[in-house]
UniProtKB/Swiss-Prot annotation:
InterPro entries: EF-G-like_DII, EFG_III/V, G_TR_CS, P-loop_NTPase, PrfC, RF3_C, RF3_dom_3_sf, RF3_GTP-bd. Transmembrane segments: none annotated. The gene is prfC. Its main location: cytoplasm. One of its GO terms (cellular component) is cytosol. GO terms for molecular function: GTP binding; GTPase activity; translation release factor activity, codon nonspecific; translation release factor activity, codon specific. It comes from Lactobacillus johnsonii (strain CNCM I-12250 / La1 / NCC 533). It is found in: Cytoplasm. Residues 9-276 form the tr-type G domain. This is Peptide chain release factor 3.
Length: 522
């Protein structure tokens, strides 16, 4: 086995997906605690104390207690290199999340055990399922009264179409929470106990002899009944199914009280796959331990360090090894680029990196070379990774600078924030109007906040409301086709499109110009 293969096998790169407020950021912090990266895990809601979640680093995230960008965190655990991508839970930022899911080898799905599967979780699950990567489930908030565990397992199959296999099982919940029956490790994990007293072994018959009082407790007896039922009618653990994404191991716990998280992390590290091969150049398979370096840009973030007004391109290494100063080719332009400055992350904290391998995420200082979706490669053979998903905006606003004397900072801020991909920029076809398009309202609020905070440029947003965006072949375009009901604009690449007032206006246009081809995006 080569040194490269050995290093690649140590990598575990995954994203955490959930509905907002299911506890995704809290479980991330607890994992970082076990990785020795942080000394204490604060709760995200404690905003007044000035103590914020490690992964919520942007000013607006700290202010509102929500994640609106994907954070990257890296640490060592049990001889493995863990790369966590903490994605935005808010639906308006799902495009950032979708792209992030293209850069991971597994996903952790966090579910609020009181609420079960919620809409955003369902949406994100579909993307992960499509990729065919393993999904690990953490049923969170066991310290509160929630739904019956059997119902939660059944819901996975009913709503998501995936088999759930229980790795542990609650002994009570809420104020009556006693612990977890650890099926996988044949032990009981007691709630709110020190490390030395936390685990009680079960004998070969599954009997608990070290705590007679608990063994006789009606809650424990109820747990044993559930486990008997699972053995009779539940799904059987199947590692091959897990790796294909057809079965999800289910763990119960409470991220807030750090209960069940360590057991989950231990199992995850052992079960989750190392970096897998990628399909490149449309139909070729590229092994992760192929010696030639290659990767793709899945995210661009401006102002991670507000003092330097910089831009970082996040690259998932798909194959080979990165070395500081490596010369690569940017596939889109064919131009050579030397990668001298690369960083690894602990949210907004950075460490200069001299080498990294397939599975790792590195940040490249970007002076404008990179775009989201770019492929880079070091060998002579061109390598192009598949396109990343792109959403068609649904809400549009005209944007102007409040202070006309600050045009320079207005343009710089707008161009940098647009390059991050959460919001899209259009220009009037025959005017100088700037029009922004987004999937949801929160993106405009974040844009406005960041323009003021990071670029000292206050903006005015004038709503155009919900519009249907449709691109048109330039050869078929006649500017006279434009009207107040179908506004003609051009995208960042200069391609023309109409912003229709509603679906009726689009149908009317198609009836009037039956030969004109409209597409939802280029």
């Amino acid at each position: 086995m080569t040194k490269l293969t050995d290093e690649v096998k140590k990598r575990r790169t995954f994203a955490i997906i959930s509905h907002p407020d299911a506890g995704k950021t809290t479980i991330t912090e607890q994992m970082l605690l076990f990785g020795g990266v942080i000394r204490s895990a604060g709760t995200v809601k404690a905003r007044k104390s000035g103590h914020y979640a490690t992964s919520d680093w942007m000013a607006i995230e700290k202010k509102r207690g929500i994640s609106v960008t994907s954070s990257v965190m890296q640490f060592e655990y049990q001889g493995k290199r863990i790369n966590i991508l903490d994605t935005p839970g808010h639906q308006d930022f799902s495009e950032d999340t979708y792209r992030t899911l293209m850069a991971v080898d597994a996903a952790v799905m966090v579910i609020d055990s009181a609420k079960g599967i919620e809409p955003q979780t369902k949406k994100l699950f579909k993307v992960v399922k499509k990729r065919g990567i393993p999904i690990f489930t953490f049923m969170n908030k066991l310290d509160r009264d929630g739904r019956e565990p059997l119902d939660l397992i059944a819901e996975l199959e009913d709503l998501l179409g995936i088999e759930g296999v229980a790795m542990n099982w609650p002994i009570g919940m809420g104020k009556q929470l006693k612990g977890l029956y650890d099926i996988a490790n044949n032990r009981v994990e007691l709630y709110r106990k020190d490390e030395d007293d936390r685990y009680l072994p079960l004998d070969e018959n599954g009997k608990l002899s070290e705590d007679e009082a608990l063994a006789q407790d009606s809650l424990y007896q109820s747990t044993l009944d559930d486990i008997d039922l699972l053995k009779e009618a539940g799904n059987t653990f199947d590692k091959d199914k897990i790796l294909r994404g057809d079965q999800t191991p289910v763990f119960f716990g409470s991220a807030l009280t750090n209960f069940g998280v360590e057991t989950f992390l231990d199992s995850f590290v052992n079960l989750a796959p190392a970096p897998q091969e990628h399909v490149v150049n449309e139909d070729e398979k590229l092994a992760a331990d192929d010696p030639e370096f290659s990767g793709f840009v899945f995210k661009i973030q401006a102002n991670m360090n507000p003092n330097h007004r910089d831009r970082i391109a996040f690259v998932r290494i798909g194959s080979g090894e990165f070395k500081k100063g490596i010369d690569v080719t940017l596939a889109r332009t064919g131009k050579p680029v030397r990668l001298n400055n690369a960083t690894e992350f602990m949210s907004s904290e950075r460490v200069q990196v001299s080498d990294a391998v397939a599975g790792d995420i590195v940040g490249l200082y970007d002076t404008g070379n990179f775009q989201i979706g770019d492929s880079i490669y070091a060998g002579k053979k061109k390598i192009v990774y598949p396109e990343l998903p792109q959403f068609t905006p649904e809400i549009f606003m005209r944007v102007t600078a409040k202070n006309v004397m600050k045009q320079k900072s207005f343009h710089k801020g707008m161009n940098q924030l647009v390059q991050e991909g959460a919001i899209q920029l259009y220009r009037g076809y025959s005017t100088d109007d700037y029009i922004l398009g987004a999937v949801g309202q929160l993106q405009f609020e974040v844009f406005s906040f960041r323009m003021k905070n990071e670029y000292n440029s206050e903006v005015e947003l004038h709503t155009l409301g919900n519009r249907v965006a449709r691109w048109i072949n330039p050869d078929q375009l006649d500017p006279k086709m434009s009207s107040s009901r179908n506004l003609l604009v051009k995208d960042r690449d200069g391609e023309p499109l109409f912003l229709f007032e509603n679906a009726f206006a689009e149908r009317w246009f198609k009836d009037k110009y039956p030969d004109v081809e409209l597409t939802s995006r280029l």
